[in-house]
């Protein structure tokens, strides 16, 4: 019970994998290299992957919750 209390007081940030996006829900292309972009944003790493409807985009592993990832319910406005 004490460990649960400590865990709640300290707080735990969860992580998730996904296509990293900007504030408009638009994916980042594979230049600059995805691994560096993902690490700069707190992820463990990343790679270039194909996303239907967007083309080549950066897929990140273990991004913190505060970094946005692609929401399939919202489209990226045309640039």
From Swiss-Prot:
Pfam families, A to Z: Toxin_3
Residue span, LCN-type CS-alpha/beta domain: 18-77
Gene Ontology biological process terms from the UniProt entry: defense response
User: Does the entry feature the keyword Nucleotide-binding, yes or no?
Assistant: no
Q: Which UniProt keywords apply?
A: Cleavage on pair of basic residues, Disulfide bond, Ion channel impairing toxin, Neurotoxin, Secreted, Signal, Toxin, Voltage-gated sodium channel impairing toxin
Signal peptide start-end:
1-17
Spell out the protein name for this chain: Anti-insect Ac4
Show the coiled coil region(s).
Answer: none
Q: In which tissues is this gene expressed?
A: Expressed by the venom gland.
Disulfide bridge partners, by residue number: 26-76, 30-48, 34-58, 38-60
GO molecular function ontology, one term from the record: sodium channel inhibitor activity
Domain notes per entry: Has the structural arrangement of an alpha-helix connected to antiparallel beta-sheets by disulfide bonds (CS-alpha/beta).
Q: What does this protein do?
A: Alpha toxins bind voltage-independently at site-3 of sodium channels (Nav) and inhibit the inactivation of the activated channels, thereby blocking neuronal transmission. This protein is weakly toxic against insects (ED(50)>2 ug per 100 mg of blowfly larvae), but is inactive against mammalian sodium channels (rNav1.2a, and rNav1.4).
What family does the database annotate?
Belongs to the long (4 C-C) scorpion toxin superfamily. Sodium channel inhibitor family. Alpha subfamily.
Record keyword Secreted present:
yes
Q: What is its main location?
A: secreted
SMART domains xrefs: Knot1 (SM00505)
Location within or outside the cell: Secreted
Quote the cellular component terms of the Gene Ontology held in the record. extracellular region
